[in-house]
Amino acid sequence: SMLSVRGLMVHSARWTAEMMRINNVEERMTLCGYGVPDEHAAIYSNEKCATYIFENQLEPYTQGDSGNIYGKMHYYNLPWPKEQLEDMGDEYVRIRITLSYYVKPSPGYAGRTHKYRYPSATLHFDLKTATETEEEFLCRRNKQEGEKTTQNDATRWNVKQQKRERGTVQSDWIECTAADLAEMDKIVVFPGPGWWKERKLDNVDNSVPYSLIVSIETKKTDIYNAVETAISNRIGVPIAQEV
């Protein structure tokens, strides 16, 4: 879909050496965005870079007692090459996540101070940390799942949440050891503010289509075949569920 096409353009983008001379990442993002797209990387995987693409749609809000409230989130249990990553141990790898979605704008609020009155809804993503359990991750992201006992490690991301969430194509990446990445196999896509939530009318049942793109990149060890095997072993098993 076009959601995935534009997501892959951003997902493949890299900062040039000249762009990297701007040391402050926030300033670099303001001036250069995500960098220069790589057409070959956007179209093809290779032995050292495997990409997952998930297309879905989320109903961000539901009707509450006194108004619209946040709906459920999508929880992805990824078909992960866990054994291969564990065997790679301390080798440094990169996981990159891109979320591309569409909104319906409210033109009357364009350019005004309240940024959440322009988009109909906003979506965001989060990734399980290497040290938290599946239950702890769910509780951290959804208070209905139980008491929150862990915190998100915001320092692990390169772009950081506040900067990446300013648009409808959000991309960020983490560089870590393969052993740590082996434990980071869960992603959630969840709703944020938007004018659909503030105005009752008929907006509560509306859904937001999105594309979630996830890549594992390595420098030394081939990863593509291990990812392909992990996917083959999960055929017929749901990867995403509402929670």
Segments from the language model and where they lie:
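Topogenic and prosegment regions of secretory-pathway hydrolases and membrane enzymes
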Residues: 1-243
